[in-house]
Design a protein with these regions (language model features):
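A structural signal for short, hydrophobic beta-strand segments that form beta-sheets
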Residues: 47, 68-70
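HotDog/MaoC-like acyl-thioester-processing domains
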Residues: 54, 58-63, 70-145
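Small beta-barrel nucleic-acid-binding modules, principally OB-folds
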Residues: 42-60
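Short, positively charged
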Residues: 35-36, 42-44, 62-64, 81-83
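Hot-dog-fold acyl-thioester-processing enzymes
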Residues: 2-47, 104-145
């Protein structure tokens, strides 16, 4: 499979891969819901919906930063938005908004966050909300607050 497509720019699947590996995985680790949690507590998140924009094309070897620009949660769901910024030229290359569920992997069913995780997420919101971007959010109505 080619990382560069016939239009001579980065294939769309690699935008998603970068958001997943360098954005979502990082957030899940901060909130103690990542790979370690999946293996030890059998609880993790599963993405159920996403909305991605391709704002300016990237070339194959371009370096980018991925930043979380919005985050919220209810008792069972996470909503977050990330931006992909060209490292050198500082342009917005892409955004993704995610709706994910917290899942008990033994039961394969949605479950509620433990108090420890709620505390970590609320602290993250408190520390970062002044930098959040609230415009064009697609999934806010899906949180049950």
């Amino acid at each position: 499979y080619k990382r560069q497509d016939y239009n001579d720019h980065m294939n769309v699947s690699y935008y998603l891969l970068m958001f997943d590996k360098y954005g979502a995985d990082s957030l899940n680790n901060i909130f103690k819901m990542g790979e370690h949690s999946a293996k030890t507590t059998k609880k993790s998140t599963m993405i159920v919906e996403s909305h991605i924009t391709y704002d300016q094309e990237l070339q194959l070897d371009d370096e980018v930063d991925i930043n979380c620009v919005y985050f919220d949660h209810d008792k069972k769901r996470l909503q977050y938005k990330m931006e992909m910024i060209h490292k050198e030229k500082k342009f917005l290359a892409s955004t993704i908004e995610i709706l994910a569920l917290y899942v008990d992997l033994n039961e394969r069913k949605v479950t509620e966050f433990e108090e420890e995780k709620i505390k970590i997420m609320d602290e993250f919101i408190s520390n970062n909300k002044s930098k959040f971007k609230y415009e064009n959010l697609k999934f806010s109505s899906k949180l049950k607050k």
